[in-house]
């Protein structure tokens, strides 16, 4: 009877996301320009919400690192000249959010608060300390400066105050008190006609996840986070938006193409799929209601694979058994993967062929339409593959985007063949050996030994200073 009731509820919901280091970090002190109500220390809420806290803490069990570059060295070529060519691991548990952004080679090895390759915005999805700093300094104040400036401040892992208004009476009374703790996310939702304060419970559940599991870019001199949704959320809409403002994340060092790098667009791809269209939320599948030892229901905060809680997730709506659904999902995942690899092969050739054209004396005017095709092809490929769960969220949309990417890449290569022929080059452009991550990185000129050594020195010297300063300022528990 309970299962029938739950299915009925789901049905109706379907109808209606050491010595050389300077002392600059130790000299930083908190700014108290505004009243701050965000408490970033997650353990503060453990006594009040023990089941939720312990299940959130269990995300530390999701500790395995998967090296995406080692698995697929083509990525190194596609991201040549961009920090992702150095290091790209698949995501793991929320408990590692701060650790992973510190340890990734993409954030470099800054020695001072003004040093390093990336802006403050790169902390934005990693910690409730971000919400605290935005409240304390304002958005302009928070985004100002380099990533390293936030080191002594952003120290607590993604947690309670990222998604809940922990200072509210509702939260104190045990209610969800969901909130968009990032103002830029609130503005983005309004841009697509979904103001958070007017949204229903199911919409709010996914919108909270969509603060971070989303495509974004760094806007203006301050490198502030913005979602490119002004024209809509489809891949073509965002492409049109980026083209209109002549935005690029970087220039590929081989082809000289002004590139776009998709982030993790789960909210967009979920919205385009059957679950999103029927308002089956992120929470329904990744954070189901479960029972504690006393039989009390609570929301499981060990965010993970729905198949790990099949009876509480998939079985609420689907009549198929677990093995049958896993087979369907595996087939869709394989189809996405197979087309992904085919697109990557075309793009790898296109980047090296474009380099050959430049080397042969091609002009900007000759290369412009070709680079535009490469840009659009890789953008569509990237938006599909950067959403790791697209085979589950929107497999048809994933295949559509990859098919479009293949067409654009083929257009680029056809134009390149014609252009190269005018330069007297009619033979196939050879590729270097990129059969491993290490060989691919060498092919684009990365000195990985130096990059890794600098990172290890940073982790041994600078990060401990950050943590000491955070404890001194009461931002971390002793």
Curated annotation (Swiss-Prot):
PROSITE patterns: MULTIHEME_CYTC
Binding site for substrate: 216, 264
Signal peptide location: 1-26
Binding residues for heme c 4: 282, 285-286, 393
Root EC class: oxidoreductase
InterPro entries xrefs: Cyt_c552, Cyt_c_NO2Rdtase_formate-dep, Multihaem_cyt_sf
Keyword Oxidoreductase attached: yes
Any GO molecular function: heme binding
Family: Belongs to the cytochrome c-552 family.
Annotated PANTHER family: CYTOCHROME C-552 (PTHR30633:SF0), CYTOCHROME C-552 RESPIRATORY NITRITE REDUCTASE (PTHR30633)
Protein name: Cytochrome c-552
């Amino acid at each position: 009877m309970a299962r029938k009731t739950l299915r009925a509820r789901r049905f109706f919901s379907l109808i209606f996301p050491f010595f050389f280091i300077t002392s600059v970090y130790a000299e930083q002190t908190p700014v108290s320009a505004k009243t701050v109500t965000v408490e970033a220390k997650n353990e503060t809420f453990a006594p009040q919400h023990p089941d939720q806290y312990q299940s959130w803490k269990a995300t530390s069990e999701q500790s395995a690192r998967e090296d995406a570059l080692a698995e697929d060295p083509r990525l190194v070529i596609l991201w040549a000249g961009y920090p992702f060519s150095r290091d790209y691991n698949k995501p793991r548990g929320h408990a590692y959010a701060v650790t992973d952004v510190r340890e990734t080679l993409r954030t470099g090895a800054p020695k001072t608060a003004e040093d390093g390759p990336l802006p403050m915005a790169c902390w934005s999805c990693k910690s409730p300390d971000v919400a605290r700093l935005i409240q304390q300094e304002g958005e302009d104040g928070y985004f100002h400066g380099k990533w390293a400036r936030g080191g002594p401040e952003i120290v607590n892992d993604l947690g309670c105050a990222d998604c809940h208004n922990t200072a509210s009476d509702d939260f104190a009374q045990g209610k969800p008190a969901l909130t968009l703790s990032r103002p830029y996310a609130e503005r983005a939702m309004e841009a697509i006609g979904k103001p958070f304060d007017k949204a229903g419970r199911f919409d709010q559940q996914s919108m909270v996840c969509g603060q971070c599991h989303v495509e974004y870019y760094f806007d203006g001199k301050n490198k502030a986070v913005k979602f490119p949704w002004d024209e809509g959320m489809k891949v073509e809409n965002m492409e049109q938006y980026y083209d209109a403002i002549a935005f690029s994340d970087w220039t590929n060092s081989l082809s000289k193409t002004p590139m776009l790098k998709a982030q993790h667009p789960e909210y967009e791809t979920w919205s385009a799929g059957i679950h999103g269209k029927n308002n089956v939320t992120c929470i329904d599948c990744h954070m189901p209601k479960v029972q504690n030892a006393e039989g009390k229901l609570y929301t499981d905060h060990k965010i993970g694979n729905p198949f790990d809680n099949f009876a509480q997730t998939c079985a609420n709506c689907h009549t198929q058994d677990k093995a049958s659904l896993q087979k369907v999902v595996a087939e869709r995942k394989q189809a996405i993967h197979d087309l992904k690899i085919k697109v990557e092969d075309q793009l790898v050739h296109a980047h090296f062929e474009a380099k050959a054209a430049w080397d042969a004396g091609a002009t900007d005017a000759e290369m412009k339409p070709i680079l535009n095709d490469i840009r659009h092809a890789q953008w569509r490929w990237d938006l599909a593959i950067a959403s790791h769960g697209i085979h589950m969220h929107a497999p048809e949309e994933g295949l559509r985007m990859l098919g479009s990417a293949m067409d654009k890449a083929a257009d680029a290569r056809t134009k390149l063949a014609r252009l190269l022929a005018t330069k007297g080059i009619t033979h196939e452009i050879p590729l270097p050996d990129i059969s491993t991550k290490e060989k691919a990185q060498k092919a684009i000129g990365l000195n990985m030994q130096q990059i890794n050594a600098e990172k290890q020195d940073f982790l041994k010297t600078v990060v401990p200073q950050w943590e000491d300063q955070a404890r001194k300022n009461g931002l971390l528990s002793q």
